[in-house]
C-alpha cells in the first residue's frame, strides 16, 4: 500500500509541472482510471486548481469524489474532506469551503451543504454572495417556508448579501403565498443599501396576481415606472395574465395594448396568454388575428399555441376548422400531444359524434400516446349524454384494463346519467360503490343526487342527503341550496324553503331568480303577500330586478287578501 501511495505522489510531482488545467485533463483521461488517489494527491490537485482560479474544475473534482467516481483504498469522501479543511492555509481554506458547499448543493445534499456552511462560518469565514445565493436557492427550493425563513434570518448577518439574495427570498415568499413577508423583504432590501430591480418587481407582481391581490400588482407596476425601472416583456405578461385570471379582462387587453405602445414586443407567452383569453371569450376570430401577428413578427408557435386555438374552435363547435389547425401544426413540425387529442375528442363528443371521438382515441394510441383518466372521462361523459350507458360501461371497463382507476369525476358522470334517467336506485348504488373504493363524494356528486330526488319530488331523500353532506363537512353550494328551495316550493312547503333561504344569507350565498320566483309564488298561494313583498325587496337589494310576472303575482295576492278580509 505504501508503494502505491509513493507512486501516486511521484506521478503528481510530474503533473504539477503542467498548467493546472492540463494536469486536471490528464487525470480525467482513460490512462489514469486505475490511478490510486490519496489525501495528499487530491489536496495538491485542488490547491493547483484553486490557485489558478479554476473553481468549476475544483468543484468537478470534488463532485467525482462525493459521487464515488473517484474512489481509493486510501480514503473515504468524509475523511478526505476532513483532511482538506484541517490541512489547508486560511486563504485556500476559504475557497475550499465554498467549493465543498457548491459541490454538495449540486449533488442535492441539503444537510451536508448546510453542515459545511455552518462549519465555514464557525471557523470565522464570511461566505461570499455567490456561494450563499447558490446555497440559498437550494435551501428555499428544498425546505418548508418556516425552515428556510429561519435559515436566512439566522445567517444574514454572517454572509455577504446582494440584491440577488433578496430576489431569491422574495420569489420563495411569493411561491409560498407569503406576500406580506415578500413586502417586508422589499423594505429590508433598501435598508441594506440595495435598489430593487425589474426582476424583483416582476416577481412581486406575479405573486400578487396569483394571490388575487390585483390592485397591489397594478400599484407595483406603476411604482416601477416612477423609480425609472423599465418593465420588460415578462413584467407585462405576468400582469396581463393576472388581470385575465382575476376577471379584469378589459384591463388585461388594455395592458396588452400599452405594452406595444411602450415599444415592448410581446413574446410567445404573452401571445399565448392573450389568445387563450380571446378563445375563452368566444372570440376565436380575434385570436387568429393575434396568431397571424405573432407569425408575422417571427415569433415561433409552440404546442400550447395550437392547443389554445384548437380548444377555442372546439368550444365553438367548428370541428372542421380545428382539424385544419391540427394539419397546420403538423406541417410546422409540431406533433399533437395528449391535450390536443383530449380537446378534439371532447369537441366531437360534444356534438354527438362518438364514432369520430373513438377514432381519435385509436389514433392517439397508434402514435404511442396513452389515453389518460381525462380521456376516458370525456368518452364516458359523451356516451352518457347520448343515453348510451352500455357504451359508457365499456369505456370504464377499458380504462380499468389499462390500469386506470375510475375517479370521483367518473362516478359523478355516471351517477348524474342515472339520476337524470329517473333511475335513482342505480345512482345511489354507484355512490355506495365509490365510497367502498375510498372515493369520498364531493359537492358535485351530492348536487346531482339531490337534483335527482328533487325532480322526482322525493324531498325526504333529498333532505337526508343534504344533512349527510353537512355532517361529512362537505359544504352545500349555491346550486344545491337553490335546487332544494325549488324542490320545497314545488312541494308547497314555504316554511322549509324560507329556512334554507335564511341559511344561504347567513353563508353569503345568493339565491337565483328561479328560487325567488318559486318562493314568491308559494307565499302568494298561501296568501302571505307581506312575506312575498319582503322577498321582492331582497331581490332588488341583491341586484335582481323582479319581472312583471312576479309583480303581478304579488298584486293579485294582495287583491285576494283584501277581498277575503271583507
From Swiss-Prot:
Domain of life: Eukaryota
UniProt xrefs under PROSITE patterns: PPR
Example GO biological process: response to abscisic acid
Recorded GO CC terms: mitochondrion
Originating species: Arabidopsis thaliana
Signal peptide segment: none
TM annotation in the entry: none
Stated family: Belongs to the PPR family. P subfamily.
Keywords: Repeat
Protein name: Pentatricopeptide repeat-containing protein At4g11690
Residue ranges of PPR repeats: 93-127, 128-158, 162-196, 197-231, 232-266, 267-301, 302-336, 337-371, 372-406, 407-441, 442-476, 477-511, 512-546
Amino acid at each position: 500500500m505504501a508503494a502505491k501511495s509513493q507512486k501516486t505522489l511521484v506521478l503528481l510531482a510530474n503533473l504539477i509541472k503542467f498548467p493546472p488545467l492540463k494536469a486536471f485533463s490528464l487525470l480525467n483521461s482513460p490512462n489514469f482510471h486505475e490511478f490510486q488517489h490519496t489525501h495528499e494527491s487530491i489536496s495538491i490537485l485542488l490547491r493547483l486548481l484553486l490557485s489558478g482560479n479554476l473553481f468549476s474544475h475544483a468543484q468537478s473534482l470534488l463532485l467525482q469524489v462525493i459521487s464515488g467516481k473517484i474512489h481509493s483504498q486510501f480514503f473515504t469522501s468524509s475523511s478526505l474532506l476532513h483532511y482538506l479543511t484541517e490541512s489547508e492555509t486560511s486563504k485556500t481554506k476559504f475557497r475550499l469551503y465554498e467549493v465543498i458547499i457548491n459541490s454538495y448543493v449540486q449533488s442535492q445534499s441539503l444537510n451536508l451543504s448546510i453542515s459545511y456552511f455552518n462549519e465555514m462560518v464557525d471557523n470565522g469565514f464570511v461566505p461570499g454572495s455567490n456561494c450563499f445565493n447558490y446555497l440559498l436557492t437550494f435551501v428555499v427550493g428544498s425546505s418548508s417556508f418556516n425552515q428556510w425563513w429561519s435559515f436566512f434570518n439566522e445567517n444574514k448577518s454572517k454572509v455577504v448579501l446582494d440584491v440577488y439574495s433578496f430576489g431569491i427570498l422574495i420569489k420563495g415568499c411569493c411561491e409560498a403565498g407569503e406576500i406580506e413577508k415578500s413586502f417586508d423583504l422589499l423594505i429590508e432590501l433598501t435598508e441594506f443599501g440595495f435598489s430593487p430591480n425589474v426582476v424583483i418587481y416582476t416577481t412581486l407582481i406575479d405573486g400578487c396576481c396569483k394571490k388575487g391581490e390585483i390592485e397591489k400588482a397594478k400599484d407595483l407596476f406603476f411604482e416601477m415606472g416612477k423609480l425609472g425601472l423599465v418593465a420588460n416583456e415578462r413584467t407585462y405578461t405576468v400582469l396581463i395574465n393576472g388581470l385575465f385570471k382575476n376577471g379584469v379582462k378589459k384591463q388585461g387587453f388594455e395592458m396588452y395594448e400599452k405594452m406595444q405602445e411602450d415599444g415592448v414586443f410581446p413574446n410567445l407567452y404573452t401571445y399565448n396568454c392573450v389568445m387563450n383569453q380571446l378563445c375563452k371569450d368566444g372570440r376565436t376570430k380575434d385570436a387568429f388575428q393575434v396568431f397571424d401577428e405573432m407569425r408575422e413578427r417571427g415569433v415561433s408557435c409552440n404546442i400550447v399555441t395550437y392547443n389554445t386555438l384548437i380548444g377555442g374552435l372546439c368550444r365553438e363547435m367548428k370541428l372542421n376548422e380545428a382539424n385544419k389547425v391540427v394539419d397546420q401544426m403538423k406541417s410546422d413540425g409540431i406533433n399533437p400531444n395528449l391535450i390536443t387529442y383530449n380537446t378534439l375528442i371532447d369537441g366531437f363528443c360534444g356534438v354527438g359524434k362518438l364514432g369520430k371521438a373513438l377514432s381519435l382515441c385509436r389514433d392517439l394510441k397508434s402514435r404511442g400516446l396513452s389515453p389518460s383518466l381525462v380521456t376516458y372521462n370525456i368518452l364516458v361523459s359523451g356516451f352518457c349524454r347520448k343515453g348510451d350507458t352500455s357504451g359508457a360501461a365499456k369505456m370504464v371497463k377499458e380504462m380499468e384494463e389499462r390500469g386506470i382507476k375510475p375517479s370521483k369525476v367518473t362516478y359523478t358522470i355516471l351517477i348524474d346519467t342515472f339520476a337524470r334517467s329517473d333511475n335513482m336506485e342505480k345512482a345511489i348504488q354507484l355512490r355506495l360503490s365509490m365510497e367502498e373504493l375510498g372515493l369520498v363524494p364531493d359537492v358535485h356528486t351530492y348536487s346531482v343526487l339531490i337534483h335527482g330526488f328533487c325532480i322526482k319530488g322525493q324531498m325526504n331523500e333529498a333532505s337526508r342527503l343534504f344533512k349527510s353532506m353537512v355532517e361529512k363537512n362537505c359544504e352545500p353550494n349555491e346550486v344545491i341550496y337553490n335546487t332544494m328551495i325549488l324542490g320545497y316550493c314545488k312541494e308547497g312547503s314555504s316554511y322549509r324553503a324560507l329556512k334554507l333561504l335564511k341559511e344561504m344569507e347567513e353563508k353569503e350565498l345568493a339565491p337565483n331568480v328561479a328560487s325567488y320566483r318559486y318562493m314568491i309564488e308559494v307565499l302568494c298561494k298561501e296568501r302571505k303577500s307581506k312575506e312575498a313583498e319582503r322577498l321582492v325587496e331582497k331581490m332588488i337589494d341583491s341586484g335582481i330586478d323582479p319581472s312583471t310576472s312576479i309583480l303581478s303575482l304579488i298584486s293579485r295576492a294582495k287583491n285576494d287578501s283584501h277581498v277575503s278580509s271583507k
